[in-house]
Amino acid sequence: DGAIPAAAAVKSWKVEERYGAIWVWFDPEGGEPDYDLPTFGDWHDETYVNGQWDYLGELNQHPMEVVDNIADYGHLSPIHGSTVARFENEFKGHNAIQRQCGGHRTLVGEGGASADLHTDTWYHGPAILVSKVSGMFNSFMMIMHTPIEDGRIKVWHNLLVKTAHGGLPTKADEIAAKQYQEASRLAFAQDFEVWSQKAPCLNPLFIPSDGAFLKARIWYKQFYNPRAKAADYLEQCEGKYVPRGMVAYTADSEEAAVA
């Protein structure tokens, strides 16, 4: 009898099984979650075809450099074939947000839901990315990465696709959704190819036309420092930002700070 020695104690973590996956809250300080697992409403919408989790493998990259993409409007054209017309970032609390629209070489087409690709993309914390997408189809994209050691992560992708007719999915809808998910996966794989080849860049030099990279890096610090410091980092980064020379996505962002 007696207390269990600290060295022999087994730690426990908050675990939820939802959306076809297992989610674990990890806090090295041992604290309870200070934000909830986001609700993916489209998962339960019967007019959407639920996708499958694509495991993309392990990546030798610090997750901070993956999150950089939320501010990297400049890569959308050369990497993904987008012609960005409007773009903005917003940072608030545990969310980092990107809103953008423009043409795209693979995810829009004649007769689709939208002539341009519109994405409303949110990071919920440092590793859960979701995006409402309107292009050839209306869809809901999920990209998750899990750190497994310093500078190494595992990555997953999923896509829910709304039927073009707005009704319950037919067999043809399921086939079309699977094809569209593959197109989405291949578009994301273009980022994966860059990450797998690049050297670490943990202390980069930023210039005004780069966008809100520095704000994104400051936002990210709240997750890799004591929780008590989070408010200090948020004070330095919260707000909406538009890259120099770019048009804001939303009208109320016209007066937003130029990144």
Annotate each language-model stretch with its function:
Residues 1-22:
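Active-site-proximal cofactor/substrate-binding loop regions of enzyme domains
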Residues 30-259:
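C-terminal catalytic domain of Rieske-type non-heme iron oxygenases
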Residues 19-28, 71:
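Extended catalytic-interface subdomain
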